[in-house]
Amino acid sequence: MKVGQVIAVVDIGSTKVCCCIASVDEHEHFDILGVGYCVCFGVKHGIIIDMDLVSKSIARAVEEAEKAANLRIKSVYVNASGKFVRSELIHSSINIGGRIVRHEDVKKLIYKSIKKNPKEEIIHSIPILFEMDSMVCTTDPIGMFSNVLNANVNVVTIPKVQINNIIVSLARCHLDVLGVVYSGYAAGLCVLNEDSNQENQIVIDFGGGVTTINFFYKGRFCGLETIPFGADNITRDIACGIRVSNLNAERLKTLHGAAFVSFDDKKNMILVPMQEENNVINLQQMPKSDLNEIIQPRVEEILKLIKEKIDKSVFKCDFANNFIITGGGSMLTGIREFVSETLKKSVKVQKMEDFSENFGIQIENDFATAIGMIKFALLSDDINLNHKDDSEKNDDIGFLKKTMSWLENNL
C-alpha cells in the first residue's frame, strides 16, 4: 500500500460496533486516525438478527470515527463471526514437473482445494504447510525445485445469507465492502508478533456474545472452534441475579467483578444502584463476594466448554503450551489465572499496544479484532478470494462482487 493510504474497518460485535480509520506510514505500518464506538443492538452470538438496529449502530460508530479522523470513508473491511463460520483443512496436490515452484503454482494449488458450495461463501483460503515430493515440508516453497507439490489449506467459509446481511447493513450506511475477515483470525493477527512465526499458538478471543478458539501454526491461521457464550452472558447474569439494569451490571462487572471469589471478597463492600418503585435509584451496600459468586459459575461454564473443544481438536498435540487470551472478556480480573488453572497451561493476556501516541488514547483489548483487520488489509499473505483477478473468478467465488452489484442497483 502507498504511504498515506487510508484503511477503514468496521467490527460488528454482539455488544458493540467499532470503526477504526488508519493511514499507512513510511515504514509499512499504520497510524490510527480515528476511532468510533457505539453500543450494538440487533446482533446475537455474532449474527445479525435486526438489520435496522445494526445499521444505526454502524452509522453512529462510523460518524464518530470520521469526526475524529476529519475525513469521510466510502469503503471498509468488515468482520464475520458466529457459530456458522466453518474452518476445514483440505489437502490438495499438483504436478510441478521438476521445475522451480512459482507463485502461480501456489495460487493454482490453493484454488484447487476449494470445494464449491452454493450456500457458503469462502472468506479465507490459507496455505498452512507445503510438502514437496513427499519429503520436504515448508511454509514457503516458492523458488524450490519439486516434482509434486502438496499442501494443507485452511478454507474458512460463512453462510452466504449471513454475509449478505452484513453487506446490506453496511450499504444502508453508504459503505462498500472491500473484504470480509473472520473475527478470530483478525484477533490473532493483532496479538501475535513476529516471534509467533516460529511457534504454534492458541488465541482465545473472549467476545461479547461469542468466544472463539483460534489455532495458529507458525503464525498461520489453521483452525477454529466457536462457543456461543461470551462476556455479555456474564453481564446478563449479574443483571438478573442482583436485579439491576444491563448498563449497571456492566459497570459492576468492570469496576468490581472478578473471575472467581477470593477470600477477602466477603469483607469488601461495594455500592449497587438498585432500582426501586417509581424508577428511583437507591444505592445499597453489598459484599463483593455476592457479585463474584454470580460471575464465577458462568466463567467456569465457558472455560469448561473451551477445554472440551481443545481436547477434541485435531490440533491438541501440536498446541500444547502456548495460549494467549484477548477480547473484551480478557479484561476481567483474574481471568488469566482461572484459564491457566482450568487448562493446566501457561496463559498470557496479550495487552494491546497504544497504536497511535498522537491519537492520545489507549486501545483496549476489545478493539483487538478491529486492529487485526487493519493488519490484515496491510500485511496479510492470505489469498482472499474476494480480491482475485476477474479472469480467475467463477460464479461461486464472485458472490461478493455480484451481491454488491445487486445492492447498487436496488438500494
Provide a role label for each language-model segment.
Residues 1-14, 20-203, 220-222, 231, ...:
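Nucleotide/phosphate-binding catalytic cleft detector across ATP-hydrolyzing
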Residues 15, 158, 257-260, 318-342:
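Glycine-rich phosphate-binding loops at beta-strand->alpha-helix junctions
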Residues 17-22, 211-215:
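Short beta-strand scaffold segments in enzyme catalytic cores
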Residues 31-32, 206-210, 214, 340-354:
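Acidic-glycine-rich active-site phosphate/pyrophosphate-binding loop
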Residues 80-83, 208, 327-328:
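Core structural elements
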Residues 103, 107, 342-370:
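Conserved phosphate-binding/catalytic loops in two-lobed NTP-binding clefts
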Residues 199-241:
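Glycine-rich phosphate-binding loop of actin/hexokinase-like ATP-binding domains
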Residues 236, 289, 293, 297-304, ...:
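Feature representing long, continuous alpha-helical segments
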